[in-house]
């Protein structure tokens, strides 16, 4: 047998083939003949086995194995109960409480713990340096000191050290106990001391724990004062919108509610001036106002545009620029102008959209159009846009600007109007600068009068009204971009190709 995992070597070849009892069924002559030789071979085998085992396991185990081999067990090792080899190997897997067989050296190296030893910490039971838990006996001293100092329950550093020595507690435990006691008295409305700030005469004499509590008291007092001020002046502050409270969340709420308050009016006026300069081609457009108009018109993409009404006026000078077809928008020249009071009834949330889509005024009229009739410029009250219409129109123009004419050239109008129509290339010379973005362009009265179209048959009324409405939206809602002249040239070329075909 072989046990390589335990270190036992295969020792069967050490014994000769002739052994007593190996041929049990043989005759007596054979047993008598091999008796002496067998005994000598057993001695030799036992001696050689003892030599091998002594080199592997040591003298005690080699002697036991040799004795077992001398008794005729052959290569089988004696697994006797008195042999302590397996308890020796399995001692490390036994429990500490079990009285297992242990090696004397291991027993000397790892003695059992002494009963007086405290095994779960660095302190023994009788160690005076071990921190003591707060008991009634120890806290009675602290309670007595607190009752004597109810008007000033803040012990100094020296008093804390003295109390810690008397009660056998640490400074941290003493400070924590006093902090909890003051907090408990405060909750029970038994405060007999005046709350002090950190800037008093004795502020530097107190510890950090005292300063933290004073800071908490100051914060609570400040919060109470703020709550009282909010209850008294809350309505006035919301109306003005210019004064902020100490709380950041309340400031944000005020800013969200007062989108068109006094704080935003200067920005809107500056943005309006910049937009007028952009219409005249004098400066770049304002990205912030465009983003405001886009934000105010979000969520209205699927809504149809309501009906817009224009007051009756002389034929306008501005040429109807090529624009998107908008069947839902209609124009009624005979409808009266809405009352100016409707602007006051609009919600506050649409104030930015109203500012972005306000109708043009005499200050925004181009200086180059000198030949236009005096009534050509529409008054601000002549074109009143509802909030939804203004926001939706602004969003619609953003989604499909004039620079994307080739994207919808496969959707032409149903048919040309029966009336006379000039070539679209005349736009380059007759359109005002705020439509084409050309700073030096001048208006031609003849071409403008030809494009006025005072009367048309019913077949072209819808399309003419759509062009007029889009023209007004172009004048009021958006400003020119740097590449706008090239876009107009492309649009004019596309429309000329469509009309020629």
Curated annotation (Swiss-Prot):
The lineage of its organism: Eukaryota, Metazoa, Chordata, Craniata, Vertebrata. Residues 324-339 have a biased composition (Pro residues). Belongs to the TALE/IRO homeobox family. Transcription factor involved in SHH-dependent neural patterning. Together with NKX2-2 and NKX6-1 acts to restrict the generation of motor neurons to the appropriate region of the neural tube. Belongs to the class I proteins of neuronal progenitor factors, which are repressed by SHH signals. Involved in the transcriptional repression of MNX1 in non-motor neuron cells. Acts as a regulator of energy metabolism. Residues 190-381 are annotated as: Disordered. Transmembrane segments: none annotated. The modification Phosphoserine is found at residues 323, 326. Residues 125-188 bind DNA. PROSITE patterns: HOMEOBOX_1, HOMEOBOX_2. Its main location: nucleus. InterPro entries: HD (IPR001356), Homeobox_CS (IPR017970), Homeodomain-like_sf (IPR009057), Iroquois_homeo (IPR003893), KN_HD (IPR008422). GO terms for biological process: atrioventricular bundle cell differentiation; cell development; energy homeostasis; His-Purkinje system cell differentiation; mesoderm development; metanephros development; negative regulation of neuron differentiation; negative regulation of transcription by RNA polymerase II. Residues 210-220, 227-258 have a biased composition (Acidic residues). Signal peptide: none annotated. GO terms for cellular component: axon; chromatin; cytoplasm; nucleus. Keywords: Developmental protein, DNA-binding, Homeobox, Nucleus, Phosphoprotein, Repressor, Transcription, Transcription regulation. One of its GO terms (molecular function) is sequence-specific double-stranded DNA binding. It is found in: Nucleus. This is Iroquois-class homeodomain protein IRX-3.
């Amino acid at each position: 047998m072989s046990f390589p995992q335990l270190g036992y070597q295969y020792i069967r070849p050490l014994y000769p083939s002739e052994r007593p009892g190996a041929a049990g069924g043989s005759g007596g002559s054979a047993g008598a003949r091999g008796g002496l030789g067998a005994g000598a071979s057993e001695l030799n085998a036992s001696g050689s086995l003892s030599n091998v085992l002594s080199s592997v396991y040591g003298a005690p185990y080699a002697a036991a194995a040799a004795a077992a081999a001398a008794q005729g067990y052959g290569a089988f090792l004696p697994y006797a109960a008195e042999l302590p080899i397996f308890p020796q190997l399995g001692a490390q897997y036994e429990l500490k409480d079990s009285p297992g067989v242990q090696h004397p050296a291991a027993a000397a190296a790892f003695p059992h713990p002494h009963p007086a030893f405290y095994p779960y910490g660095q302190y023994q039971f009788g160690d005076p340096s071990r921190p003591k838990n707060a008991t009634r006996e120890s806290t009675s001293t602290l309670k007595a000191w607190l009752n004597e100092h109810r008007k000033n329950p803040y012990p100094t550093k020296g008093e804390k050290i003295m109390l810690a020595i008397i009660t056998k507690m640490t400074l941290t435990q003493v400070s924590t106990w006093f902090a909890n006691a003051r907090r408990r008295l405060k909750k029970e409305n038994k405060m007999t001391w005046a709350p002090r700030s950190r800037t008093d005469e004795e502020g530097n004499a107190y510890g950090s724990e005292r300063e933290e509590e004073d800071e908490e008291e100051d914060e609570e007092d400040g919060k109470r004062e703020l709550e009282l001020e909010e209850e008294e002046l809350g309505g006035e502050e919301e109306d003005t919108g210019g004064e902020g409270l100490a709380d950041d969340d309340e400031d944000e709420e005020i800013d969200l509610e007062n989108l068109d308050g006094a704080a935003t009016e200067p920005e809107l006026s500056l943005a309006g001036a910049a937009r007028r300069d952009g219409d005249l081609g004098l400066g770049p457009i304002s990205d912030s106002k465009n983003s405001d108009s886009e934000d105010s018109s979000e969520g209205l993409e699927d809504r149809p545009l309501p009906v817009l009404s224009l007051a009756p006026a002389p034929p306008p000078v501005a040429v109807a620029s090529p624009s998107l077809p908008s069947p839902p928008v209609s124009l009624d020249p005979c409808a009266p102008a809405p009352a100016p009071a409707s602007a006051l009834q609009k919600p506050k949330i649409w104030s930015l959209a109203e500012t972005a889509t306000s109708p043009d005024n005499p200050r925004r009229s181009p200086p180059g159009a000198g030949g236009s009739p005096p009534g050509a410029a529409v008054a601000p009250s002549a074109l009143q846009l509802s909030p939804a219409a203004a926001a939706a129109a602004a969003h619609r123009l953003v989604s499909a600007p004039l620079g994307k004419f080739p994207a919808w050239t496969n959707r032409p109008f149903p048919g040309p109007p029966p009336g006379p129509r000039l070539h679209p290339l005349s736009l380059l010379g007759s359109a005002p600068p705020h439509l084409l973005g050309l700073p030096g362009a001048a208006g031609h009265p003849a071409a403008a009068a030809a494009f006025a179209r005072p009367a048309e048959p019913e077949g072209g009324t819808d399309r003419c009204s759509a062009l007029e409405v889009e023209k007004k939206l172009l004048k009021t809602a958006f400003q020119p971009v740097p590449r706008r002249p090239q876009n107009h040239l492309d649009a004019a070329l596309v429309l000329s190709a469509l009309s020629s075909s």
